[in-house]
Amino acid sequence: IYIEEYKPLAIWQFRKEIIILDRDGYHIERIQNKDSHNNLLLVYGDEADLNLSEFIDALENFPSIRKRIGHVTFIGKRRWDLHFKEGVKIQLPMGNTYDVLLELDQHLKDYNLIEKGHKKIDLRIKGEISTDRIFKSNQ
């Protein structure tokens, strides 16, 4: 007999269901209340469960970003939005999640965007960051 234990990593809220996921998006169990699992990453969006692994692999390299995340949303079955606990929405482009998070991490340090009160950061155009003004990256 072989027993495999799945390690809970995220809570996926989709439509009216709340499901605990492992890092590969495997549905561990349905739950009624997400509040009892507030240590897990909260995830929204159609097919977020199928795309979680690549996102988590990248995010694990950026603990300073991870600790700020209140929840993430998979948009249009192709890209992620990060929602920070401070009320900031960060729009990521499709693909290359690691590179984009590296760029975001650097921008947050260089420009102090959160501390300056920016509530929306758009990284969907490569080499640019826009909030209420546009910043050109050095890439």
Q: Over which residues does each language-model region extend?
A:
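Charged, solvent-exposed interaction patches on well-folded alpha/beta domains
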Residues: 1-139
